Amino acid sequence: MTLTVDHAMNIAQVLTESLPYIQRFAGKTVVIKYGGNAMVDDDLKNSFSRDVVLMKLVGINPVVIHGGGPQIGRLLERVGKQSEFIQGMRVTDKETMDIVEMVLSGQVNKEIVNLINRHGGHAVGLTGKDGTLIHAEKLHLTQDRDDPTINIPEIIDMGHVGKVKQINTRIVDLLVQSDFIPVIAPIGVGENGQSYNINADLVAGKLAEALGAEKLILLTNTPGLLDKEGKLLTGLNAEQVQSLIADGTISDGMLPKIQCALEAVHAGVRSAHILDGRVEHAVILELFTDEGIGTLIRNRH
């Protein structure tokens, strides 16, 4: 009996601790980039879906942007097509783009929507092509040439890899106002109707800016931002983050995520959060508890 009472008291403590956060964020929009291990582990997938439904239930407006790199890679391998990566991005020819679009919009997006709906939510799946949500343009990368005597960098054609040119929030606004949960695959459309594969972190950041979101949440496969000793950095302002970039603490795969977060907070998003998607209920723990579990970035304290 004592264990049961203790357990009940713990639940009550969690609920009362969450109350001021629920009140603070009611009516606010939270953009979540969903990816990494959280998308491939069944328990984590269900945990994430329940978190999103709970957010909507208490008056928060979640908007989900998802990736799907591992799923794309598996299908490309099955059809015998090799993937080439440059600066961490997949070179995407026409055939690869067709597969990317098939996987993201036809498989991954529908699975997320189905899980959210199974847990009592009302999710609607979109790509950036729906309602001209994501206007895209071709992304060109540059790299130093092999010949050191040539100072002009080489321009790399990445095929159907794009960047966000403009966000048209109308369809998302309509869905949110109608109590639906938008789930968006990061495929944009160009001026000529071409499809472009866009990094999901970048789409999430730009969408958070365009929606005037309260928060941008990026789920990753790390605990958050770590210092050089491997200790979690829980709260930072933009100036501190820039210093960590300058001294090399933030580098490699984390750098694009952090730059995306910085751009969002500079553009008016109240805060950006780097969370460990491998932790069950990571989103709810960050939003509704005093301690949180990841790294919070604000423009200023």
Curated annotation (Swiss-Prot):
Compartments where located: Cytoplasm
Record-listed substrate binding positions: G68, G69, R90, N197
Protein's UniProt keywords contain Magnesium: no
Gene Ontology cellular component annotations, sorted alphabetically: cytoplasm
Enzyme Commission code: 2.7.2.8
Pathway(s) it belongs to: Amino-acid biosynthesis; L-arginine biosynthesis; N(2)-acetyl-L-ornithine from L-glutamate: step 2/4
Pfam families the UniProt entry points to: AA_kinase
Site note Transition state stabilizer, residues: K33, K257
GO molecular function terms attached to this record: acetylglutamate kinase activity; ATP binding
Keyword hit for Transmembrane helix: no
Reactions accelerated catalytically: N-acetyl-L-glutamate + ATP = N-acetyl-L-glutamyl 5-phosphate + ADP
CDD domains (alphabetical): AAK_NAGK-C
Annotated InterPro entries: AceGlu_kinase-like_sf (IPR036393), AcgluKinase_fam (IPR004662), ArgB (IPR037528), Asp/Glu/Uridylate_kinase (IPR001048), Glu/AcGlu_kinase (IPR001057), NAGK-C (IPR041727)
GO BP term (any one): L-arginine biosynthetic process
Enzyme's top EC category: transferase
Keywords: Amino-acid biosynthesis, Arginine biosynthesis, ATP-binding, Cytoplasm, Kinase, Nucleotide-binding, Transferase
NCBIfam families linked: argB
PANTHER family (UniProt xref): N-ACETYLGLUTAMATE SYNTHASE, N-ACETYLGLUTAMATE SYNTHASE, MITOCHONDRIAL
Family: Belongs to the acetylglutamate kinase family. ArgB subfamily.
Function statement: Catalyzes the ATP-dependent phosphorylation of N-acetyl-L-glutamate.
Annotated protein name in UniProt: Acetylglutamate kinase
